[in-house]
């Protein structure tokens, strides 16, 4: 079972931010999708880091599929498309602000849609969660609670870790959301 952020752990790989994980009621409050609640810029960031691994995985899945089957053809087509998306994601500088800007384009939004693909999305989100865990381990935090993972995801890994230090526990923090988002689904 994968812990899903922003849903008390009960969300799914296709969970949309703002939609209740059990009743499926509500209105989307952002582009955040899935276990890791990836924003479009996160999807671009993760694809630029791990895209080749995903393409190879799709090709391996195709090789293991029945020869000449629709599934094999579908996976091969998907691998070609994902390779193209990976090249595009890597064509921009590896900077968060550039990923945010690119995420607002049609191509950037198309890349974000890979989260909804059953062969790509769940794994992309798990890789994002694993990255948070690895960052925490490098900082000496071996075990994280769901809330701590959520904080790192929301604030950014480094800032999230800083916010968990004793000095930061009493410091004021930024409100990451627009006020209207709090009232939209009540």
What residue spans do the PLM features occupy?
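Catalytic glycan-binding domains that act on GlcNAc-containing polysaccharides
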Residues: 1-183
């Amino acid at each position: 079972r994968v812990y899903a952020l922003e849903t008390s752990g009960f969300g799914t790989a296709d969970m949309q931010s703002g939609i209740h994980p059990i009743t499926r009621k509500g209105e989307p409050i952002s582009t955040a999708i899935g276990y890791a609640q990836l924003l479009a810029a996160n999807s671009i960031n993760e694809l630029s880091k791990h895209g080749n691994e995903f393409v190879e995985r799709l090709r391996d899945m195709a090789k293991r599929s029945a020869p000449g089957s629709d599934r094999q053809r579908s996976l091969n087509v998907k691998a070609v498309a994902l390779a193209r998306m990976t090249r595009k994601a890597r064509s921009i500088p590896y900077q968060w602000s550039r990923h945010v800007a690119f995420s607002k384009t049609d191509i950037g939004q198309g890349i974000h849609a890979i989260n909804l693909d059953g062969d790509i999305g769940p794994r992309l989100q798990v890789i994002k969660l694993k990255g948070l865990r690895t960052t925490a381990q490098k900082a000496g935090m071996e075990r994280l609670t769901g809330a701590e993972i959520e904080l790192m995801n929301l604030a950014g890994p480094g800032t999230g870790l800083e916010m968990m230090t004793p000095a930061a526990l009493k410091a004021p923090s930024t409100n990451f959301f627009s006020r209207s988002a709090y009232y939209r689904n009540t």
